A protein has these predicted regions:
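N-terminal secretory signal peptides and thylakoid transit peptides that target proteins
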Residues: 1-17
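Serine-esterase "nucleophile elbow" of acetyl-processing enzymes
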Residues: 29-90, 109-110
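Short amphipathic alpha-helices and their capping/turn segments at secondary-structure boundaries
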Residues: 29-39, 101-113, 143-152
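Structural recognition of the beta-strand scaffold that forms the well-ordered cores
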Residues: 40-42, 88-92, 115-119, 157-160, ...
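A structural motif corresponding to the C-terminal end of an alpha-helix
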Residues: 78-86, 146-156, 188-203
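Oxyanion-hole/transition-state-stabilizing segment in secreted/luminal serine hydrolases
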Residues: 98-139, 163-164
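Substrate-gating cap/lid alpha-helix
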Residues: 166-204
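Histidine-centered active-site loop/cap adjacent to the catalytic His
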Residues: 185-189, 198-201, 216-239
Length: 239
């Protein structure tokens, strides 16, 4: 069957927009430079959820994804956004212990590549592990193992628990002998190190913060604005 010239022109007009229109995927690839977006997840305690402890409301996850160039010009162009498309899913909660981690993954949906940051153990020490003689530490290890095994994100970057006394026993603020506290802090960090070898990498906040000063902290134990940036400094090269 032969088509009239007029009908052929009409069909060509209909087809032209379809040919010219890029696919949704093509448009997304163009917007991201061809790189698929990935997600930075944060889990754990106030080391990662410290926005309420500074006037700017910033926490390490935010600074990692998008630096505040006015506050921290040193990190201009060094944030994760500079490497490509990335989003933050912030789930860490101030005050969390290892038993609270399960609630932080409730409703979690993962798609595409991702990296998880985890800081945990400091509140567990404050709530009893600092004076523990063994049983509590085993429960901590078991609970952390359960959480990490179920977490559908790899790698996991585990941050060690820092020491706000800078290793100075005269700054001890607990009613437990400093030697006992330090031994249990070391045990918690050893547990974190073991899981970091298995599931990702270790962010040694403890070692880094020993080289800091009191301006890195507020309210004795919480990261200050500077402290939030220093937490970011430790995690950044591991991502």
């Amino acid at each position: 069957m032969r088509l009239s010239i007029a009908r052929r022109r009409w069909l060509a007009m209909l087809a032209a927009p379809l040919i010219a229109m890029p696919s949704t995927r093509s448009r997304a690839d163009a917007a991201t430079g061809g790189n698929p977006p990935w997600t930075l997840f944060t889990f754990g305690d106030s080391i990662l959820d410290c926005g309420r402890y500074n006037a700017h409301g910033v926490h390490p996850g935010q600074l990692l994804v998008r630096n505040d160039d006015a506050l921290f010009p040193e990190f201009k162009g060094r944030d994760l956004q500079a490497r490509g498309p990335v989003r933050l899913e912030h789930r860490a909660v101030d005050g969390a212990t290892v038993d609270d981690l399960a609630a932080q993954v409730r409703g979690l949906r993962t798609s595409g590549p991702g990296v998880a940051l985890l800081t945990i153990g400091g509140n567990d020490l404050l709530r009893g592990l600092a004076r523990d003689s063994g049983a509590g530490m085993r429960r901590f290890e078991t609970a952390l193992d359960r959480f990490l095994t179920a977490l559908p994100i790899r790698p996991v970057l585990l941050g060690t628990v820092y020491d706000p006394t800078f290793g100075d026993d005269t700054r001890n603020f607990l009613d437990v002998a400093p030697a006992i506290v330090r031994a249990n802090l070391r045990r918690v960090n050893d547990i974190l190190g073991t899981f970091a070898q298995r599931d990702g990498r270790l962010a040694d906040l403890h070692a880094h913060f020993l080289r800091g000063d009191p301006s890195w902290f507020t309210r004795t134990i919480e990261p200050s604005l500077i402290g939030a940036s220093e937490v970011r400094r430790v995690f950044l090269p591991l991502i």
